[in-house]
Amino acid sequence: MTTQLTNDAHRHIGVMPAYPFYGGAPVNPDMSARATLAELIADLDREGTERALVLPNYGVPDAKVSFGFNQLVLEAAAKDDRISCGLWVSPRPQDAEMTAKALELAGEPGVKALKTSFLLGGSVEDPECQAQLDNMFAVAREHDLVVHFHTSPGAASDIDKVGQLVDKYGDDAKIHLVHFGGGISGHIKLISSRFFDWIEAGKQVYTDTSWAVGFAPRWLASEIERRGIGHDRVLFASDEPWGDYAGEAARLAAATGDGELGRLMFADNFTTLYGK
């Protein structure tokens, strides 16, 4: 585990109700979820996290839960200058009213990002989601916000799907691909060429290595060094409570070492993207 102070570019706050995921009994897999700012700050202090981008927790198929956490992240950003926040928004047409209200908060102090996912429904290719996506990116451009998209193998979160958003919107909006593709297929597609092709094409694409399979951070660091680009596009993220801070930090530190690349990913890239 790294002993340096870190900046965490993607973590969550909010305790969700138990839910019977995948047909099982109601559970709370995110067992370290935090309900209060005091609990969150205690975690930051224990970890040595100097600054953090905090986002509403999500995962249960009830959009109102995550939208309800928008006020919590705004309060966190207002009360502690170590914390910036992102607002939960949704591409689903049935959530359009709640998304519109959330986007009205984009100019509030401390708001640096918008967070969304297709895990709860919708698709990049669904025409009924297009108006919401256009609105999200219009607001992101207006307020210079970073749009965070969940990526993982399969279905609507696959990098082949989410990557279409980089192609369409990445020229003039910043996009953070959370979890670097989320699995082996996404890692290989991105590291072998796609991530670097986007950068060379002028796309404003960023990512992190949370949830990454063991080989990926090593290979990514090696390709960045070999190609000489991408060092300013990767940020450390714990994804707490769905990720594990200690594990994520140790894996990235092992891949990047204690030199310039490690410093950029653990600290400086966050400052460049989100300000001091």
Question: Where do the model's predicted regions map?
Answer:
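Active-site beta-loop-alpha junctions enriched in small/polar residues
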Residues: 12-14, 57, 88-92, 117-121, ...
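Catalytic pocket-lining loop regions of alpha/beta-barrel enzymes
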Residues: 125-235
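Generic structural signal for well-ordered alpha-helices
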Residues: 37-44, 70-74, 99-103, 133, ...
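Short aromatic-enriched loop/helix-cap "lid" or pocket-rim segments at secondary-structure transitions
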Residues: 17-22, 98-99, 161-162, 187-191, ...
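Short, flexible/disordered intra-domain loops and linkers
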Residues: 22-31, 61-65, 123-127, 184-190
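Active-site gating/metal-coordination segments in enzymes
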Residues: 50-51, 60-154, 201-203, 276
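Hydrophobic faces of well-ordered beta-strands that scaffold small-molecule active sites
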Residues: 7-11, 52-54, 84-89, 112-116, ...
